[in-house]
Swiss-Prot record:
Glycosylated. This is Odorant-binding protein 47. Its main location: secreted. Glycans are attached at N117. Keywords: Disulfide bond, Glycoprotein, Olfaction, Secreted, Sensory transduction, Transport. It is found in: Secreted. GO terms for biological process: sensory perception of smell. The keyword Iron-sulfur does not apply. Head without antennae (at protein level). Present in the aqueous fluid surrounding olfactory sensory dendrites and are thought to aid in the capture and transport of hydrophobic odorants into and through this fluid. Binds N-phenyl-1-naphthylamine, menthol, citronellal, 1-dodecanol, decanal, p-tert-butylbenzophenone, 4-hydroxy-4'-isopropylazobenzene, 2-pyrrolyl-p-methyl-azobenzene and indole. Expressed in mosquito head but barely detectable in antennae, which suggests that it may be present in mouth structures, such as palpi and proboscis, and may have a function in taste. It comes from Anopheles gambiae.
Length: 228
């Protein structure tokens, strides 16, 4: 499948994004109380973003358990073409790796912000939800009809989740450069993209999911860990 090799390279850098998305366990408690109406999958997404690498046993830190791209298991709706994502990944992954060793408030994911900027979805700490919805739904037109509702529900859940941790997101946006040339990116882009990727993959209709050991392992892994 086209671009699978490029995506495999991106998955190898998953540790960097875990650092960007991690926050504190106290925030997780508040999120879960306020988001009781969300399904278990969405709570799992909240757990990742709110706890991140706080716990030594975080299953996300080692990356995917198998050398297989998720698109080989289930092709999900997408925001941008793989080539656009890889352009952003190539530009920013060097900085992201350097940020991995930094402590304190999680820094925003510039790969994700670059993706949002490539479609003019990001501006001033805000994501254009209406435009984002149109792009995701446009990608579902040639896909199974079930994806339409799944995508809309995912968008709704992810934006609600982001709203519950807005204080932490804003704190990350107010950081100053820690090393020469560091670009400070707003955490909102990474938060939304991570949530969408995890949710869509987890909700892949059974008839569209390739059932084998590797894909089952990826599904379990990505129920806890993002793709970016």
């Amino acid at each position: 499948m086209k671009h699978l090799k490029a995506f495999d390279e991106a998955q190898n850098d998953i540790k960097a994004v875990q650092k960007r998305l991690s926050t504190s366990s106290t925030i997780l408690s508040g999120i879960q109380k306020n988001m009781a109406h969300l399904n278990l999958l969405q709570i799992g997404v909240l757990s990742l973003i709110a706890v991140g690498s706080v716990f030594a046993g975080n299953p996300c830190l080692k990356g995917p358990p198998v050398p297989k791209n998720a698109a080989e298991c289930c092709v999900t709706p997408f925001l941008v073409e793989p080539s656009a994502f890889m352009t952003c990944h190539s530009k920013w992954i060097g900085q992201t790796k350097r940020q991995m060793a930094m402590e304190g408030i999680p820094r925003g994911c510039c790969v994700a912000e670059c993706v949002m900027n490539s479609t003019s979805l990001y501006s001033n700490g805000k994501i254009d939800r209406e435009a984002l919805t149109k792009l995701y739904l446009a990608s579902t037109k040639s896909m199974a009809p079930e994806w339409n509702k799944i995508t809309l529900d995912a968008i709704d859940g992810c934006f609600k989740m982001a709203d519950t941790i807005k204080d932490e997101i804003e704190a990350g946006a107010k950081l100053t450069p820690a090393f020469e040339g560091e670009q400070i990116c707003h955490p909102i882009s990474g938060t939304i993209l991570a949530c969408m990727g995890m949710t869509l993959f987890a909700e892949c209709p059974a008839k569209l999911f390739t059932v084998n050991d590797d894909c089952n392992k990826l599904k379990s892994y990505h129920s806890k860990c993002p793709f970016l």
